[in-house]
Design a protein with these regions (language model features):
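Carbohydrate-interacting regions of secretory-pathway proteins
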Residues: 23-245
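Bacterial N-terminal signal peptides that target proteins for export
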Residues: 1-12, 21
């Protein structure tokens, strides 16, 4: 009797385990079906993936404006690039964005003039408010939270990953926007930045305090991408963005 009970018990256990395994497999399979990630085709050599908004591919400045007027910076079609036109002011996107992944390439002038903040200065402002500094920081001293890759006036880069003047460089930026709350407070955001593929900002907090000389102030759900005219002929190319919210 004891032996029989043991057999039954083992059989029951085996059946229960089998049912449990089937249920788990079915649940896992359903989860995969429900949550299948969208297919995105990567770009070649840093070009835009299939789900990105192309902001600049070298052919035109249609996505950009200077204030309320047409874009005034110089289009260099032969190089698929654009260049800061001194004195015309910032260039900004017509579209506005919240949380994003941004890819942008830039080059400071190969002919070196000036020093410190006067050498190859421009900047990439998320929402026109929070500047990731563009500067020739190759053998060029300045204050640390103002060098290339700094969250300007807030946080120095973790390392100096600068290429020499005139060379093309990349920023890949994950920006989580500070979010204005109903009670008037601001939920902090963050910057994660790769400079030439090297991590230089790692979830750096953004409390809502704008960078000095920002185009706009105050936290906002969405704002334009803004490129700075700091009087130096800095070039940009291959700019694309993916919306994350
Ligand atoms: Mg700047």
């Amino acid at each position: 009797m004891k032996k029989k009970f043991g057999k039954l018990s083992l059989t029951t256990l085996a059946v229960l385990m089998s049912i449990s395994a089937h249920l788990q497999a079915a649940e896992s399979s359903d989860k995969k079906k429900d949550q299948a990630p969208p297919i995105v085709t990567p770009g070649e050599n840093g070009s835009a993936p299939s789900d990105a908004i192309v902001l600049f591919d070298g052919s035109n400045l249609d996505e950009w404006q200077s204030g309320d007027a047409a874009a005034k910076w110089t289009l260099l079609k032969a190089e698929s690039a654009m260049e800061v036109k001194k004195g015309t002011g910032v260039l900004q996107t017509k579209k506005t964005f919240g949380d994003v992944q941004l890819h942008i390439e830039w080059a400071t002038p190969s002919e070196v003039t000036g020093s410190g903040q006067g050498r190859g200065n421009s900047g990439v402002y998320l929402q026109g408010r929070y500047e990731i500094q563009v500067l020739d920081s190759f053998n060029n001293e300045t204050y640390y939270n103002g060098q290339a890759g700094a969250f300007y006036n807030n946080a120095a880069p973790l390392v100096n990953a600068s290429r020499p003047p005139g060379k093309w460089q990349t920023y890949d930026i994950i920006f989580v926007a500070p979010k204005p709350q109903e009670d008037g407070s601001v939920k902090p955001g963050s910057f994660t930045v790769l400079h030439n593929g090297i991590l230089i900002q790692h979830q750096t907090p953004i409390t809502g305090k704008a960078s000095t000389a920002a185009a706009y102030s105050g936290a906002t759900p969405k704002g334009p991408l803004v490129l700075q005219d700091h009087g130096n002929p800095v070039r940009y190319r291959n700019i694309w963005i993916r919306e994350l919210n």
